[in-house]
Amino acid sequence: MKITDVRVRHVSSDSRLKGVVTITFEDAFVVHDIRVIEGENGLFVAMPSKKMPNGGFRDIAHPIHADMRKQIEDSIIKAYKETLDAEATASVEE
């Protein structure tokens, strides 16, 4: 399945949440509310989830195979870093 679009909304706050992402597959299927989070070992991608009655969380949508997960994570982290670079460049130019 081909990733055809990745859109990042940068979150500027003191929290671990760094961005919220929408990803499109094959110009036909969209997944919203994927989160980019700063963890102890760097950035990671958290799939959209809902809170369960027991207090835990369950993914609403997620890849089944490791290679697809890697493809999604790599695309999202790359787009996130490009967004940060573009924002930094825009700040310098102002």
From Swiss-Prot:
Domain of life where this protein originates: Bacteria
Any one GO biological process: sporulation resulting in formation of a cellular spore
Entry's transmembrane regions: none
Keywords from the UniProt entry: Cell cycle, Cell division, Septation
Tagged with keyword Ribonucleoprotein: no
HAMAP family (alphabetical): SpoVG
Protein family according to the UniProt entry: Belongs to the SpoVG family.
Function noted in UniProt: Could be involved in septation.
Protein name: Putative septation protein SpoVG
